[in-house]
Design a protein with these regions (language model features):
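Active-site HxH/HxHxD metal-binding segment of metal-dependent hydrolases
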Residues: 189-190, 198-248, 364, 370-372
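N-terminal secretory signal peptides that target proteins for export/translocation
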Residues: 1-8
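Asp/Glu-rich intrinsically disordered low-complexity tracts
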Residues: 38, 42, 47, 54-56, ...
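Long, structured stretches of catalytic cores involved in phosphate-ester chemistry, encompassing
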Residues: 322, 328-405
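Metallo-beta-lactamase
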Residues: 187-199, 343-347
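Bacterial N-terminal signal peptides
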Residues: 13-24
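Sec-dependent signal peptide cleavage junction
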Residues: 26-37
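Core dinuclear metal-dependent hydrolase active-site scaffold
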Residues: 95-187, 259-342, 406-439
Length: 439
C-alpha cells in the first residue's frame, strides 16, 4: 500500500479465431438488488530535482500480513471440486466481430437478467473500487487499499517513504460489498487492475482468489520503468501479488490473463454493457523511455449501455509527476472516448487531471470523484455551480455512511442512488465574482 494514493485514499466459453476472442458466461444466480486523507501518489508532488513483467514474474515471498503466496495452497484444496466443475462447464464458441467498423477483440458474457449498474464504492480515504453489473454478470475495476505491506526483508520490496502501514486497508469492506450485491465465484466475468498503485490494486489478489474472474486485465509494470524514485512506493510488491494470483487463476480454473491490448480495440460485452478498454499510452512508450508515474501506464474503461455512456478514468493525468509538465494524455484519451454522460474523474479529482479542454470534450452531466472536495480544483466541477452537473465526492459521501453511489442504466437514461445525506461545499476562486456552492 502507499500513503500518497492510499488514503487521499458459468459457465465460460473461450476461443480465439482470426484475432477475435469470445467468452460467454451465464450466471448461476441473478444479482441481488443494490440498495482523511492520507497521501501516497496523490500528495502534492515533491521537487523532483531534490529527490534522489509480464505474467512470468516471480511471486513475492511472504512479508508482514500478506504476500502473493498466502492462501494459495488452502485455496487450491478448498476449491478443487469447484474448479473441476468449472472446467466441466466450459464450452468454446467463436464469432467474427466488428465494433464501429473496426476489427476488435471482444469478450462476451451475455448473462441472463438483472439491472445494469455501475457501483462506485466509498473507501477509506481516496481509492478506486468500482463494480459493474448487467444481466446478473459482474466485473470489478480495481479494489482499493488492502491489508498488508512489504516489511523490507526482501530486497525486491524495500521499505520506502510514503507506503501505507500494513494494518490499513479496505479488504473486508470491498469483498463484503461484492458479496452483498450478488458477486460469486461463478459470475465475475472480469477483473481490471488499472495500474500498479496500491489504492487501486492492493486487493486484486484477494478479489481474484475469492471471486475467480474469468478474464484478468492489467497492464504490465516494472519498477525499472519509473524514472522518479519518489514514485516507487510498494508498486512492485502489490503488482507481483496480483500477478501471482492471476497465475494461480490460470492454473486452477483456466482464467485468461491479458496484459497487452491493441490500441482501443478491446471490448467486453457484459450483459447489456459494452466495456471498452482505454490504455493511456497505447504504444507503451514507457517501456523504452521510462515514465515518472505508474498512473501514466494505466488503462481506463468506457462503458456504453442503452445509448448512455460513462468513462472510468482511473488515474489519468495530463501532467508528469510534477503536476506541471503537460503530456497531452487527456487530449489523446478525449479523442478516443468522446462525449459521455458520467465521468469517474481522473486521479481522484486532483489538480494533475481533468483540465478544462478534457472536461469540455467529455461534457459529462455527472461527475463521481473518488476523493474529497477539499482538494478539488475549480475546473473539475465548474458546471456544478450553474446547476448543470451532478457531483459526488466519495470521501464526503462515505463520511455520511453511504456505501456507494450507484448509476443505473436503462432505456429511460441513467438514474443515481440517493446520497442526499452527504453534505459539502466548494469555493470557486476562479469565478468572478467569487462563488460558493453548498450541497
Amino acid at each position: 500500500m502507499n500513503l500518497r494514493h492510499g488514503q487521499l485514499w458459468q459457465r465460460l466459453g473461450l476461443a480465439v479465431l482470426s484475432g477475435i476472442l469470445v467468452a460467454s458466461l451465464a450466471p448461476a444466480t441473478a444479482a441481488a438488488p443494490a440498495g482523511g486523507q492520507d497521501m501516497h501518489g496523490d500528495m502534492e508532488p515533491a521537487d523532483l530535482s531534490q529527490t534522489n513483467t509480464d505474467s512470468g514474474v516471480a511471486a513475492p515471498v511472504a512479508s508482514q500480513d500478506r504476500a502473493a503466496s498466502d492462501g494459495a495452497d488452502a485455496s487450491d484444496a478448498s476449491d478443487s471440486a469447484e474448479s473441476a466443475d468449472s472446467a466441466d462447464e466450459a464450452t468454446a464458441s467463436s464469432e467474427e466481430e466488428s465494433v464501429g467498423g473496426v476489427d476488435a477483440q471482444v469478450y462476451t458474457f451475455p448473462g441472463t437478467n438483472g439491472p445494469t449498474r455501475i457501483h462506485v464504492l466509498s473507501t477509506t480515504g481516496s481509492a478506486d473500487a468500482i463494480l459493474l453489473e448487467s444481466r446478473g454478470v459482474f466485473a470489478m475495476i480495481d479494489g482499493a487499499e488492502g491489508v498488508g505491506a512489504p516489511d523490507g526483508k526482501d530486497p525486491r520490496y524495500p521499505l520506502r517513504r510514503g507506503v501505507v502501514p500494513g494494518w490499513v486497508g479496505d479488504t473486508d469492506r470491498v469483498l463484503g460489498y461484492m458479496s452483498k450485491h450478488g458477486v460469486t465465484s461463478s459470475n465475475l466475468a472480469f477483473y481490471l487492475g488499472t495500474h500498479a498503485h496500491s489504492d487501486h490494486i492492493d486487493n486484486a489478489d484477494e478479489i481474484i482468489r475469492k471471486f475467480r474472474p474469468k478474464v484478468i486485465f492489467s497492464p504490465e509494470y516494472s519498477d525499472k520503468w519509473i524514472t522518479n524514485p519518489d514514485g516507487l512506493w510498494d508498486n512492485q510488491w502489490i503488482y507481483d501479488n496480483m500477478v501471482a494470483a492471476a497465475q494461480w487463476a490460470q492454473k486452477t480454473y483456466g482464467a485468461q490473463f491479458i496484459q497487452k491490448v491493441d490500441g482501443y480495440n478491446t471490448h467486453v460485452q457484459l450483459g447489456d454493457m459494452d466495456v471498452q478498454l482505454i490504455p493511456f499510452d497505447p504504444e507503451e512508450t514507457y517501456k523504452v523511455k521510462g515514465t515518472t508515474d505508474a498512473n501514466l501506464m494505466g488503462w481506463g474503461a468506457k462503458v456504453n449501455a442503452f445509448g448512455r455512456s460513462a468513462f472510468l478514468a482511473a488515474d489519468l493525468m495530463d501532467t508528469d509527476a510534477d503536476w506541471t509538465t503537460h503530456n497531452g494524455f487527456e487530449e489523446r484519451v478525449a479523442r478516443a472516448v468522446g462525449r459521455v454522460d458520467m465521468l469517474k474523474a481522473g486521479h481522484h479529482g486532483l489538480r494533475s487531471s481533468n483540465f478544462p479542454p478534457f472536461m469540455e470534450a467529455l461534457d459529462p452531466t455527472a461527475i463521481i470523484q473518488t476523493g474529497s472536495e477539499s482538494y478539488t480544483p475549480d475546473n473539475l466541477t465548474e458546471k456544478v455551480i450553474h446547476g448543470d452537473v451532478l457531483w459526488a465526492p466519495m470521501s464526503e459521501v462515505g463520511s455520511a455512511g453511504i456505501a456507494s453511489v450507484i448509476a443505473t442504466f436503462s432505456s429511460a437514461g441513467i438514474s443515481y442512488s440517493d446520497f442526499s445525506a452527504a453534505s459539502w461545499g466548494h469555493e470557486y476562486g476562479q469565478e468572478s465574482p467569487r462563488a460558493w456552492w453548498f450541497k
